[in-house]
């Protein structure tokens, strides 16, 4: 561990990398069995699913290249065996299997070979319906390919003797299980085809496991049936058993006994089927006659005279006219009632003009007297304010014997101390004005010299 990491304390990424290395280096080449669940197929063609058993599950990813090699698409609930790289997705620390190979659980390579050959034959058209040969209605001779010791042979012969004892039977013996059985079956079919002694050939054996039925899934047997010039009926195993021989045969029977019944006519059954067919035909004809009669009656009821249709239209127009008249009358009444209500409301809202007229006359009479009184008060106030203004006016003060002395700059002289000898002054009296000059050589009463 010290060679892989630089510290005894691992980071999460180091732990995941270490676990991934252990899994990939020590768990290679394993096959894991389980049930498919949570299956998702992405648009890219990849599969993502879980493989589970009764106690645990593991996430699996199967990429497009491996998925293309599947014999058939995976389905939810499939019991399979997978092989691939067992690893950890480091980013999330999730244990997963990157699947490279898949096979059905319990079948392994045998089932894979079956599916590969089936896909190949299907691609070649070996199972196509158009290459199937019809069975003869009444064969002159029936051939059987099976083991002489097989119970299936006894079942087939017993059925043929019961149903068509007059038809001869030829058996082409071959082992139907074990080593070399596929080759023997193929040779027996080829022999029957070459001799052309029979009109139809039954290839059959009893039921068994897929291993027991292995010979009927081998390519030599399938190719021999495909190349056979005689119509071949397969009766291999039970109804639930399907082999490649069943797919390539001209007709597949669920059992060996069923194959014998298919190729042998039964006079009593044929007569019975004929009677049944006659009964069914009669029933069908009677039902068709009854249906046609009902349809004819219905069509007859649908056909009406033009006058009847015109009367219906006239009645409809009359009804519409009545409805329109009634609607207009109701509308007019509603508007009239509304107009009357609004007229009454307007009358209640109209003011009493006579009352307002009396108020106007009274106000017109009182207005001149009020205006005269207001004017007298305004004149009296104006006279008082004029007298007050006159009393404090400069002109009135001058008339009382005062004068105003100003220097050459127009400033009023209020104190004699600011005067200088020879200073020019301007004096304003109530009735005129004059210019003087200051002279200190005289007494105060002669302070100024007239200029």
UniProtKB/Swiss-Prot annotation:
Protein name: Exodeoxyribonuclease 7 large subunit
Keywords: Cytoplasm, Exonuclease, Hydrolase, Nuclease
Gene Ontology terms describing biological process: DNA catabolic process
Record's keyword annotation contains Nuclease: yes
GO MF, any single term: exodeoxyribonuclease VII activity
Record field: catalytic activity: Exonucleolytic cleavage in either 5'- to 3'- or 3'- to 5'-direction to yield nucleoside 5'-phosphates
GO cellular component labels: cytoplasm; exodeoxyribonuclease VII complex
Predominant localisation class: cytoplasm
Subunit details: Heterooligomer composed of large and small subunits.
Entry's localization field: Cytoplasm
Family indicated by similarity: Belongs to the XseA family.
Function recorded in the entry: Bidirectionally degrades single-stranded DNA into large acid-insoluble oligonucleotides, which are then degraded further into small acid-soluble oligonucleotides.
Broad class of enzyme this protein falls into: hydrolase
Catalytic activity, EC: 3.1.11.6
The organism of origin for this protein: Neisseria gonorrhoeae (strain ATCC 700825 / FA 1090)
